[in-house]
Every structure is written in C-alpha cells, then in structure tokens.
From Swiss-Prot:
ATP binds at residues 13-16, 56, 60, 163-164, 169, 172. Pathway: Pyrimidine metabolism; CTP biosynthesis via de novo pathway; UDP from UMP (UMPK route): step 1/1. UMP binds at residues 55, 75, 136-143. The gene is pyrH. It comes from Mesorhizobium japonicum (strain LMG 29417 / CECT 9101 / MAFF 303099) (Mesorhizobium loti (strain MAFF 303099)). One of its GO terms (cellular component) is cytosol. It catalyses: UMP + ATP = UDP + ADP. PANTHER family: URIDYLATE KINASE (PTHR42833), URIDYLATE KINASE PUMPKIN, CHLOROPLASTIC (PTHR42833:SF4). Its EC number is 2.7.4.22. This is Uridylate kinase. It is found in: Cytoplasm.
Amino acid sequence: MTVKPLYRRVLLKASGEALMGEQHFGIDVSVVDRIAADIAEARGLGIEVGVVIGGGNIFRGVAVASKGGDRVTGDHMGMLATVINSLALRTSLHKIGVDAVVLSAIAMPELCESFSQRQADAYMNQGRVVIFAGGTGNPFFTTDSAAALRAAEIGADALFKGTQVDGVYSADPKKDPNATRFERISHAEVINRGLSIMDTAAIALARENNIPIIVYSIHEKGGFGDILRGGGRCTVVADD
C-alpha cells in the first residue's frame, strides 16, 4: 500500500555543524551523502525539495564579532561557507542521479546561479532540488532566517529543521535528564519559552506565513522520509 506524503513542497534546513560528522571542522562526505539520500527519498515520493545549509562547520561570523572583529565582514565570510556546503550537497545529489541546482544570494556566476524567486519556483516545478546558498545575502541574519524566508518565497508547505536532537525539548536534553520532548507546540510558545530551536526572527517569519516547522534529528537515517510519510519522531511547531 502506497502512503501518500503529507506535503507537496518542503524546505529542509540543515546546520553546517551537522556536516562535520565526528570531525571538528569541515565536511564529512559520508554525512553529506546520507543527507542527499534522504532528499532523494523525498523526491521519490514526489515531494519538491528546497534546501538551506548553514556554514558553521567552516566559519561563523558571530564568532568573529565576539572577539572584536567586524561583524559585517564575518557574516560575509560565513555566507561563502554556505556556498561551499551547498556545492558539496549538489555534488552528492548528482552522484545518485538527483537533479539539483545551487542558487546563491551572492552573485558568483562561475560557481552557481544567482537567486531568483521565479527561477527557484520554476526549477522546483521541474522536479529539481534547489539549494539556496549565501544566506539572505545580508549580514546580521542567520541561515535559520534565510530558511524561513526562502520557505515563504517558494510557498513551502513546511520548514524542516534537521538538528542534533529529535525534536523540541523543554530544556537541553544533553544537560537536563528531566527534559521532555514536545509532540506539538505553537510558534508563540516557542518564542515565549525562549526555546532555542531557531532564532526568533525565523520563527516569527514562519508564523506570519503559516508555515509549520518540523524539528527532527538529521542524524536519524531515513528519518526525513518517515516524517514525510506521517511517521517518525519529531516536534511540530504550528499554531492551531
């Protein structure tokens, strides 16, 4: 029996740190390949997929600012890190026969196309995976905010946030053994409780555009596909 997926079009946000695997820096190709396989599974279900990847495995602009450096320049460097990660994911997708394209918020035509909402929509309608690089193209905005923005622009039915844990918890489960996982929670409650799944601007933007956020563990092999079919372990952030 074929299970009909719950969504037509989704945006997947993966942190740059997730790409490190067990390393302390850079890209673990096996991890990128696994994420690519999860995306391929979603495409096999007929779901259109957009992707935003952070750059924290290579560079974080906010870290520069915390040490007295220039935040704007640091953020620009972080944007370049997201392009590196996006190209790595595109390569992994191409290896398994999935058509993918990188659209960057920063013009660099020798490496990838520049972002255009219309072009992104057209590519997704054609069944291509669209990887959005370069954040929003502006400093002081996180890649979480970029993910929420792109999700709104492409009309995504949901924003999937692949994290280090399998959902939203009342406290950090790595520090508090009594932390409990929410099955469902509203955007407003996430903000009011100060739960750090995404920055406040990203959550607010998703809320304003009625985009549910699905928080799950990106390290769970096949977890993305399980949730797309209506199963899996996750937290749904949505207003009733």
